[in-house]
Swiss-Prot record:
The modification N6-(pyridoxal phosphate)lysine is found at K232. The keyword Cell inner membrane does not apply. It is an enzyme of class 4 (lyase). It catalyses: L-aspartate + H(+) = beta-alanine + CO2; L-glutamate + H(+) = 4-aminobutanoate + CO2; L-cysteate + H(+) = taurine + CO2; 3-sulfino-L-alanine + H(+) = hypotaurine + CO2. Its cofactor is pyridoxal 5'-phosphate. This is L-aspartate/L-glutamate decarboxylase. The lineage of its organism: Archaea, Methanobacteriati, Methanobacteriota, Thermococci, Thermococcales. Optimum temperature is higher than 97 degrees Celsius with glutamate as substrate. It comes from Pyrococcus horikoshii (strain ATCC 700860 / DSM 12428 / JCM 9974 / NBRC 100139 / OT-3). It holds the Pfam family Pyridoxal_deC. GO terms for biological process: carboxylic acid metabolic process; coenzyme A biosynthetic process.
Amino acid sequence: MKFPRIGLPKEKVIELINEKTKKDLTFSSGKILGSMCTMPHDLAIEVYTKYIDRNLGDPGLHPGTRKIEEEVIEMISDLLHLEKGHGHIVSGGTEANILAVRAFRNLSDVEKPELILPKSAHFSFIKAGEMLGVKLVWAELNPDYTVDVRDVEAKISDNTIGIVGIAGTTGLGVVDDIPALSDLARDYGIPLHVDAAFGGFVIPFAKELGYELPDFDFKLKGVQSITIDPHKMGMAPIPAGGIVFRRKKYLKAISVLAPYLAGGKVWQATITGTRPGASVIAVWALIKHLGFEGYMRIVERAMKLSRWFAEEIKKINNAWLVREPMLNIVSFQTKNLKKVERELKSRGWGISAHRGYIRIVFMPHVTREMIEEFLKDLKEVLS
């Protein structure tokens, strides 16, 4: 496609976009079942649109938006049982995880740094390892798909700069034994990073509802940083990931001076320079509007629906759960999995076959009616 010399009327451009996006699945259809993102909350869309010109890459021009980000980090830190946290709203969990690894590396004096992480960890750590020159040391999983803490300990060496635990794995929504990892980290004087990109906006509310889940946050003294994504169960617009550090030294270790900005020179810790302030304002608006009780109701509905679905899967011939769900993610296997996946996708379902199983993520846009329709199609495909 050539760069056009003469532009088209606005109406024609919109018409072309509508035509090109016809094949896209939409959250409003209810048929996207394999995504950890969802349709943003109406308030978030309104706020994001109004403040779309704000750039936190140059915070001196937007001091009000910078203050809002500080308050967002304060509120998220409070949710995570930390009185004074230090961090940013970033592009997503990938950037947040890379920042954590970079901070651990920069504060170490190791020539050949190593990071110990579960085999269930997100692929963003592979990017972090390649970009930062950090060797990834993969820890084995237990039969229940949580990380084997004994194997983590066995792999600690003089080169270990950090340990990673997962609070809501991508494939199964499993929460590692973070308390045990925290104790281990303290015993060896090694920082622990918790990737709660998904679970961060689920676990605090699920625990309040009575679900038995391990502690995962700054209540545990070994935890030094947490990834938490408002654009997942927080219902914020993309991009809105989050990174929170226990101590300011971690942010300082990854900050570089940007001396030429219109709003004045500033120390910048994020990977991206230009950064959408609209995302930050939308997150602030949602936390203020929904509050703990509002998010708890969202999580309650998702957890109940996921438990009902898990029981329905158990009733279907030639389908079985990989494990009982911990969060609002249910994964199951079938006979002829690839064929089943193709058939379901041909019927319009946005699912993912992850490591040999189909994963259903019960996000706020997923309804009981659509899940009943999915189960009907699944039974037909398996019959």
